[in-house]
Amino acid sequence: MTPDRSLPIAMFDSGVGGLTVLHECLVSLPAEDFLYLGDSAHFPYGTKSAEDLRERVVANTEMLLGRGAKLLIVACNSAASAGAEAAREIADAHGVEVVTVIDPEAEIAAAISGTGRIGVLATPATVAGGAYRRALEAQGRGLDVTEVSAPDLAPIIQNGFPFDQSVLDTVRFYCEPLRAASVDTLILGCTHYPLVAPMLQRILGRDVRLVTAGHAIAANAQRILESRALESATSGEGAYRFLCTGDVFSFRELGTRFLQMPLGDIEGV
């Protein structure tokens, strides 16, 4: 079963963090329509158990595919770490492929690291799930991986805008073990973290390469659409819509900063 090419690309995250991924997709795939679900009523995902995360992945996947989609992007690292297979099981029944944030980042990091010392800055749930370590080990380079669990970083980023000294101090704290390990490449293992990339770069130094998922995910999505002849048949500008399980006003206010574009229709669900 092949989905209709006129359907949107669906994407979900625990809130607004995944909008950093959507931003890259809107730029790279301008003719495509997108349907984004922000599960902000259940934010943050990063401190939830694997079982709770799988429940959210199942609920979000069923909601989005029930509305119709030709591709599903899990734009949340914690959700992908614990629930990617659950999403794929549901998506398979709809003939829909699933793209996650973890494998593309691991592939890029392994390819660009000169020393093989790679850092992963992520939520507790993502680190505990071990998905990044497995993905990096699968690259077959004998990489030296340093994982840093940052339980409060995503909430601080989401709630602390505009950023003050406390945000910088928090970022600096989580950089200490990365500097001690002399990593030359850092995976930003949460879609909130690109917003503090300038702080990370300043603290770690210009020689450390920062890896984010947005561009790689957009490239993977384009490859899948082309291979399955699912690209949009129109050449004009696609539409993007939003679903939100939490407060719509807060989602709009925060989301505009993350997406760096206006948010149009937001449906509370």
Where does each model-flagged region fall?
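Non-catalytic structural scaffold of enzyme domains
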Residues: 1-269
